[in-house]
């Protein structure tokens, strides 16, 4: 039986972008329906992405720190890795958050329908699951269906030892020899996790750099610190993956030199993600897709059909949960009649590796490309009392200032908890702060966050925690 549902707003997808949009719509008094293909809210991020990866990265960090404590006089035995318990702990964390979302949905009186959605017209869509079929008529729709991993056509993905990020986070096993293809954020984070859990990890990338948006002085610090964790090979691509009963046999080309018959127990393909829009029936309603495969939207997240919105990964890069959350808020507010726009000055990015890498605004090389008259101010963490005391002095805080007005235009941090520090830099850029604003803001001592204030002091020529090279200028 085809049931008919009527609503003011239908949101397709319950990841961070989708549930944020639905919750905001409900808070603004709009009758809201949420459609989710799976049995739990939260999308990739909460269920098989951001949250489980951070749970495992925390475990990896503790393992590494415990190992390094021997130099202080505290030694531990080799850790006993119980994969079943780790998986249960990871799922406990996921369940706690998804259950919280479910509770908030109920309290907001948002109706939810599980199943696959496809547009029938620009005012209706069909939702089907194994038991039911619904037709939902709406005034406004928000598409928030997220993204999926990109596959390499020449690799036999039907073999259970060829993984994507979801497989890697399910902890199927801890492979003795593990190959990761792709040195983006996902690849580097998975390398961090599995090397800590005992795998011998090779990570390869066909390009001559990893995380290409960051500056070389930031990436070089990271590269030096991972030498004992895993093997990073750039300028390397896969030639062939042969499936055998006991192993995956890989041939690769490293810096134009063939490397043949390398045995791996598992291979993770982490070369990026693509918008999850193929099965929505967008062609039926004439929804425009841009040249990069994303749904085309304006700064109010409207598509070319004004009452249909797109947010999150389907609406363009950067494909980050926090960007999608803010887009969800804007879309809901526009639907409710508010004249709001999605126009952030900057969006932060973080690689939750060990050490972490975080950046926001312009990098130095981007400032060069834009012909900006800029100046770099760096505070090295080997001059930070807190970093030295915490055994994390490998790192630096780097700020970029426009020399014409001394305003901050970008920042990068590599080091422990860099992701927790970068927010101050983002706020400073959004607020239009200049170096003096940051330098005269009293930061607590000893903290890692004071490295931001001290970097501004380097620019100002007032720093006393390192040599002041501006004294005679």
Curated annotation (Swiss-Prot):
Lipoamide dehydrogenase is a component of the alpha-ketoacid dehydrogenase complexes. It is an enzyme of class 1 (oxidoreductase). Its cofactor is FAD. FAD binds at residues 36-45, 54, 117, 313, 321. Disulfide bonds join 45-50. It comes from Buchnera aphidicola subsp. Acyrthosiphon pisum (strain APS) (Acyrthosiphon pisum symbiotic bacterium). Coiled coil: none annotated. Binds 1 FAD per subunit. InterPro entries: Class-I_Pyr_Nuc-Dis_Oxidored (IPR050151), FAD/NAD-bd_sf (IPR036188), FAD/NAD-binding_dom (IPR023753), FAD/NAD-linked_Rdtase_dimer_sf (IPR016156), Lipoamide_DH (IPR006258), Pyr_nuc-diS_OxRdtase (IPR001100), Pyr_nucl-diS_OxRdtase_dimer (IPR004099), Pyr_OxRdtase_I_AS (IPR012999). It is found in: Cytoplasm. The active site is a redox-active disulfide bond. It holds the Pfam family Pyr_redox_2. Keywords: Cytoplasm, Disulfide bond, FAD, Flavoprotein, NAD, Oxidoreductase, Redox-active center. GO terms for molecular function: dihydrolipoyl dehydrogenase (NADH) activity; flavin adenine dinucleotide binding. Its main location: cytoplasm. This is Dihydrolipoyl dehydrogenase. PROSITE patterns: PYRIDINE_REDOX_1. The keyword Zinc-finger does not apply.
């Amino acid at each position: 039986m085809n049931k008919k549902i009527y609503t003011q707003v239908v949101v397709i997808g319950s990841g961070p972008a989708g549930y944020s949009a639905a919750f905001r719509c409900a808070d603004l008094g709009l009758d809201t329906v949420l459609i989710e293909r799976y049995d739990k809210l939260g999308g990739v991020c909460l269920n098989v992405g951001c949250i489980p990866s951070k749970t495992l990265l925390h475990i990896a960090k503790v393992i590494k720190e415990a190992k390094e404590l021997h130099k202080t006089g505290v030694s531990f035995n080799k850790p006993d890795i119980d994969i079943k318990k780790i998986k249960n702990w990871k799922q406990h964390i996921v369940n706690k958050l998804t259950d919280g979302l479910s509770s908030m949905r109920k309290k907001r009186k948002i109706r939810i329908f599980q199943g696959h959605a496809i547009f029938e017209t620009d005012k209706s869509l069909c939702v089907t699951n194994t038991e039911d079929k619904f037709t939902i008529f709406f005034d406004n729709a928000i598409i928030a269906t997220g993204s999926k991993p990109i596959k390499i056509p020449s690799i036999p993905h039907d073999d259970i030892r060829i993984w994507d990020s979801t497989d890697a986070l399910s902890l199927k096993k801890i492979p003795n020899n593990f190959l990761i293809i792709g040195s983006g954020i996902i690849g580097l984070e998975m390398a961090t996790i599995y090397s800590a859990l005992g795998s011998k990890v090779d990570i390869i990338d066909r390009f001559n750099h990893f995380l290409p948006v960051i500056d070389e002085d930031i990436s070089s610090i990271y590269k030096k610190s991972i030498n004992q964790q895993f093997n990073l090979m750039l300028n390397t691509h896969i030639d062939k993956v042969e499936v055998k009963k006991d192993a995956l046999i890989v041939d690769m080309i490293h810096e134009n030199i063939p490397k043949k018959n390398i045995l791996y127990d598992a291979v993770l393909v982490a070369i990026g993600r693509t918008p999850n829009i193929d099965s929505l029936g967008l062609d039926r309603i004439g929804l425009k897709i841009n040249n990069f495969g994303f749904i085309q939207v304006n700064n109010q997240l409207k598509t070319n059909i004004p009452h249909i919105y797109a947010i999150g990964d389907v609406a363009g890069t950067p494909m980050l949960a926090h960007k999608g959350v803010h887009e969800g808020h804007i879309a809901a507010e526009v639907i409710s009649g508010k004249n709001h726009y999605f126009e952030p000055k900057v969006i932060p990015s973080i690689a939750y590796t060990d050490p972490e890498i975080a950046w926001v605004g312009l990098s130095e090389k981007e400032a060069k490309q834009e012909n900006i008259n800029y100046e770099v101010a760096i505070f090295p963490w080997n001059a930070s009392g807190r970093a030295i005391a915490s055994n994390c002095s490998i790192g630096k805080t780097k700020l970029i200032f426009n020399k014409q007005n001394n305003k901050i235009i970008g920042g990068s941090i590599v080091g422990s908890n860099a992701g927790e520090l970068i927010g101050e830099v983002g706020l400073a850029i959004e607020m239009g702060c200049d170096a003096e604003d940051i330098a005269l803001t009293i930061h607590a001592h000893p903290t890692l966050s004071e490295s931001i204030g001290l970097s501004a002091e380097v620019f100002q020529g007032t720093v006393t925690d390192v040599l002041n090279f501006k004294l005679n200028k």
